[in-house]
């Protein structure tokens, strides 16, 4: 999964040209030397198109296909597998006191709605992955509730992606400030969910 635009809390959107400049040579290099599937992490259709031309074969949109209205039709046209993620707000403001009445229901309803939208647009359900969006517009309590209850989201009927690798939640749980030192905590969180069916980890 290759991305050129930071989506960490507080990060600002960069231009399409800059995002393409960052990812295109990397994807081209990898695809020329390996048959490994490459996913592009982007919210923008023009970036996804450039990545596809360079060798990417999947789109991972952290906005859940709400940022660029042209991206969904493009993915449908190219028959690309997709990952749809829940986030609340944009990276620059998503951690400004996020609130939910019921985090499980609200995230589930969003993902269910977006999955149905993807299917209606022509993307087969078996080509869709759902991501609960750990750290995207959620505080520690929200994140822990989602992680502990991730089996709830199997009701969506698609594989689930649990992305916790080196995120700040590991620091808040284990007091590991340097992201480079959070790998053990990341593995521990993922390991506790290994018995769940159709769950992917990043």
PLM feature spans:
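Glycine-enriched alpha-helix->loop->beta-strand junction motifs that scaffold or abut catalytic
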Residues: 50-58, 76-82, 156-159
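Alpha-helix-loop-beta-strand connector modules within alpha/beta enzyme cores
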Residues: 13-38, 78, 150-160
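Conserved small/polar residues in nucleotide/adenosyl-binding loops
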Residues: 192-198
């Amino acid at each position: 999964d290759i991305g050129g635009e930071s989506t960490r809390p507080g990060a600002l959107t960069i231009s399409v040209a800059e995002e393409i400049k960052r990812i295109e040579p990397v994807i081209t290099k990898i695809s020329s030397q390996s048959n490994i599937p490459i996913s592009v992490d982007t919210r923008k259709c023009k970036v996804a198109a450039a990545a596809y031309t360079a060798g990417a074969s999947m789109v991972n949109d952290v906005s859940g296909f709400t940022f660029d209205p042209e991206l969904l039709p493009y993915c449908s046209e190219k028959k690309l597998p997709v990952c749809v993620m829940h986030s609340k707000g944009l990276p620059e403001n998503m951690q400004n006191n996020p609130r939910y009445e019921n985090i499980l229901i609200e995230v589930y309803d969003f993902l269910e709605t977006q999955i149905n939208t993807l299917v209606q647009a022509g993307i087969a359900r078996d080509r869709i992955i759902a991501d609960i969006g750990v750290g995207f517009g959620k505080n520690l309590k929200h994140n822990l509730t989602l992680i502990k209850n991730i089996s709830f989201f199997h009701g969506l009927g698609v594989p689930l992606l649990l992305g916790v690798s080196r995120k700040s939640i590991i620091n808040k749980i284990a007091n590991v400030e340097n992201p480079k030192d959070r790998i053990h905590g990341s593995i521990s969180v993922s390991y506790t969910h290994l018995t769940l069916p159709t769950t992917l980890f990043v």
